[in-house]
Amino acid sequence: MILVSAKQAESAAVQARLTTEQLKQDHQLANMDMIMRLYEFANSAEVQAAWLTVLTARISSYEDFQKLPKSDQVAFYQIGALFESLGVLVEREIVTVQIVEDMFLTQLAWESMKPFVAGVRQRFGEEESYAAFERLHERILTK
């Protein structure tokens, strides 16, 4: 009887270990899937067009941003939202800062977007606008 109980306990321990390993693998696959979807989104024609607009606009102030056509202004909001989302994912440890750094040009995005972010914060009185994007930028700088 004791031998049977010991075997049952051993089997339960093996099952628990295997289940834990399976859950870890499922979590890794889900994260990898999310990262690939983000990357696919970031490489869509719409986002790439927005990225090109932000890079070529070369704004040096919020006033420069306001002079842009509305479609170009929307590009800044799109890229800002993308990097804000990436910052939140890093802060919540859903993706690592290393993955974001490997896959996206965060520093270039921040430098191109800084006048826009400062202007949005001032205009709307909301210091938290694009805060996760800024923290992501700072985290990469201090790595």
Regions inferred by a protein language model and the residue ranges of each:
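Intrinsically disordered cytosolic tails
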Residues: 60-63, 107-108
